Amino acid sequence: MAGIISPSPTALYFTSNVGGRRLKAVSWAGKSVSGNVIRRRSLRIAAELKFVNAEEAKQLIAEEGYSVVDVRDKTQFERAHIKSCSHIPLFIYNEDNDIGTIIKRTVHNNFSGLFFGLPFTKVNPEFLKSVRNEFSQDSKLLLVCQEGLRSAAAASRLEEAGYENIACVTSGLQSVKPGTFESVGSTELQNAGKAGLITIQGKISAVLGTVLVCAYLFIQFFPDQAEKLFPPTS
């Protein structure tokens, strides 16, 4: 009696570098038994994540037709983003009101939120759906975030969903020099992640440092006047 054996992977497995992109190839063998054994083989190639610097990213957009997808939260996106990009955040504001979330949000807002201006977020459950609604699986996507971590995580999810032409900017937008991309917003792309008390502290430190340097120079060059202004304590 004829029988069908479902496809299973063989021992053939290799990786290769092609055009700066790592490739995996897996050979699948399907066996159809009907008197004589007939073997069919097909090759499935999956492109892995490609990391590029800012200049290479600019070339991907201009020369290879990559679309920019900004996966940052709304706050950083509004401060500065690449012109004509799509905004599909990997994380969204967490406004849940269960007791556990309220406690976590309060702790976050009094530490990370206060000092670094980081919003309290959760994974966007509509991320994949939003990408699918805007881009087909054969689209070329350049994912960007502020540090490079969220874009890498987003790329991993998209690869699992069948997207193969994906690139990310190494170290994110914080590594982009002013003028590299045409941007929209109140600040430069590399500064969009800076917020909270740490930005004020930086300005205070600069002013305080200037005052101390001036005081030191005054004491060195005008010791008599300095002694009158700051008499030594007995």
From Swiss-Prot:
Highest taxon listed in the record's lineage: Eukaryota
First and last residues of the transit peptide: 1-47
Keyword Transferase: no
Record field: transmembrane: 204-222
Pfam families attached to this UniProt entry: Rhodanese
Membrane topology: Single-pass membrane protein
Keyword field: Chloroplast, Membrane, Plastid, Transit peptide, Transmembrane, Transmembrane helix
Domain Rhodanese: 62-185
Residues the record marks as active site: C145
PROSITE patterns recorded: RHODANESE_3
A single Gene Ontology CC term: chloroplast thylakoid
Chief subcellular location: plastid
Database matches in InterPro entries: Rhodanese-like_dom, Rhodanese-like_dom_sf, STR9
Localization per record: Plastid, Chloroplast; Membrane
Keyword Plastid: yes
PANTHER family: RHODANESE-LIKE DOMAIN-CONTAINING PROTEIN 9, CHLOROPLASTIC
Protein's name in the database: Rhodanese-like domain-containing protein 9, chloroplastic
Organism: Arabidopsis thaliana
